[in-house]
């Protein structure tokens, strides 16, 4: 007796839930498998992608050729005095701001790069 897929589906559909559970148990035993759903393994770096970063650090990596403009930009962004801003620029690489939003970090990076500095967001 050979059943088509359609006939097999109709036969299963006509069974009660308890009969289907018994059928599944018998199939598991016959074929040596389990009907349990396997959990999908996360893709490489999945945990990092799922946990999106919300706080960023802006790091001045190099002052560039126009140090005066960079010092002015650092003063405007951080509120430091002239001497503190100059010391910070000359001690590059240095953290300018820590724990700021992505938008604020991007704005600061843009302003410093326009002044001639090399900046990283971490």
Curated annotation (Swiss-Prot):
Keyword Ribosomal protein: yes
Keyword annotations from UniProtKB, A to Z: Ribonucleoprotein, Ribosomal protein
UniProt cross-references to InterPro entries, sorted A to Z: Ribosomal_bL12, Ribosomal_bL12_C, Ribosomal_bL12_C/ClpS-like, Ribosomal_bL12_oligo, Ribosomal_bL12_oligo_N_sf
UniProt GO MF annotations: mRNA binding; structural constituent of ribosome
SUPFAM superfamilies recorded: ClpS-like, Ribosomal protein L7/12, oligomerisation (N-terminal) domain
Cysteines paired by S-S bonds: none
GO biological process terms on file: translation
Gene Ontology CC: cytosolic large ribosomal subunit
Highest taxon in the source lineage: Bacteria
Assembly and binders: Homodimer. Part of the ribosomal stalk of the 50S ribosomal subunit. Forms a multimeric L10(L12)X complex, where L10 forms an elongated spine to which 2 to 4 L12 dimers bind in a sequential fashion. Binds GTP-bound translation factors.
Role: Forms part of the ribosomal stalk which helps the ribosome interact with GTP-bound translation factors. Is thus essential for accurate translation.
Similarity annotation: Belongs to the bacterial ribosomal protein bL12 family.
Protein name, as recorded: Large ribosomal subunit protein bL12
Species per Swiss-Prot/TrEMBL record: Actinobacillus succinogenes (strain ATCC 55618 / DSM 22257 / CCUG 43843 / 130Z)
